């Protein structure tokens, strides 16, 4: 991984250590030590200054062996090697350090009992290796793994590490993102190999790996496991999806994710899906309970662009192939001002449209520009906007439009094809109302990776969405919102030491209506209520609901149950309105992104937030 890649970077210092005797010889001469030796072959590091200190130094000119004992410290640039004993055999071009071996570069530190290095072959090994790596100091952004820790320090242990100029291999390796002992979380593997890639990143392969939680719970990891700065899907996704307008309900979904291709610029993930509730009793047979998903991404760094392809087949029933397939291809370009241009084609895209429920957009072809968040001077106001043009094929009402959601659902059976121009903007500002004073006695995090930021904030905003359709219809919505967000408690005590409350009210002016169902606005005035509360230890429960104040109906709701620790957590959430849910494993800093495999649809009743 990127942090451990420092090992051979630091150990490479010893590859330059052949100049050590020359530097030490000067000190030895002052003490009446060995006579000057031939240093013709030692000029490779003439431009580098190597300093060596120890309690005792000797040089055997006949055997060409230099030895230092007692509090040995060798410095080369920013690198420091410490040991009880150091022996450099110039004839064999080999260095051996023994006893409390320590290699340090800035905040990176690696220790062991014995280090052996062959200058000629540029190979070596370190026994009983352990240490910590400050991954915040490493610059190879594509290297594995970033992130096992928000503290930016990764600790590791290995029985032995073999290394050369481009690879290292560890035996019985344990990695942890926990600064305390015993660690809450460890990644264990009997064999870990890291290989330097052409782009400067490292490929980490862990064989027969495990995640160990609190030394009592063990979860297997894939044989081939890679960590880097790129988001990727977790090894296994578990979620629930039992709501679909066309009755293709899948229920519980078990989805292993296999990375068939992955480098910093290209990735291909193939994800078989198993629907246990459809395996028995389905009229379509056993294959109706099996699905398949594929995700492909291609980054073009020189063009600041990324192309992605998603496809999902919900049941291997070829007679209904067109109905069961969902797909999307998208090309995104980051502009010089920090905005983003996107070109998209989507087939059978799912949208959640509030009181209109799930809607299927059969075909959508379009382009959009999303601005970065712009701070307006010293006002504290944040502005963002979005412009989009699409050609859409979806269920709709081209002529007379039913503004009542129930009538619209009952009377809309035909697909229509129209072009749409959509403009949207948001203007927000947050006001801190209260925060507790900071003290030196504030306890360190216990159930969270980082200290909890406590306080009460007032949030205000104005948003506008304008949509124009090629049949002459238009939909306009401009609204204001105000809300309170409160976080009380540091989440370190055993009970009721964390409470998060959120209340947001919004109201606006609605004119016209979309001819489509998927983007029709049906909720003009709404209230959002949410809370997250610690019960005992790492256990928290929460809920969030959105209520249409004009009809009194519950538009959306989600319930959460979480088990959170410093370095990992489990989360179970369920939405009875959408009839969907998910079980997620969070490993702090580990770059698994459950959202990449989630079935959650886009919200269609507003313009997508910039």
Task: Give residue spans per PLM region.
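Hydrophobic or amphipathic alpha-helical targeting/insertion segments
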Residues: 109-127
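Long, low-hydrophobicity, solvent-exposed regions enriched in small/turn-prone and acidic residues
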Residues: 2-69, 73-80, 92-94, 104-106, ...
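A low-complexity, Ser/Thr/Gly/Pro-enriched, surface-exposed linker/loop concept
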Residues: 87-88
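Short, tandemly repeated low-complexity microdomains enriched for cysteine and small residues
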Residues: 98-99, 126-130
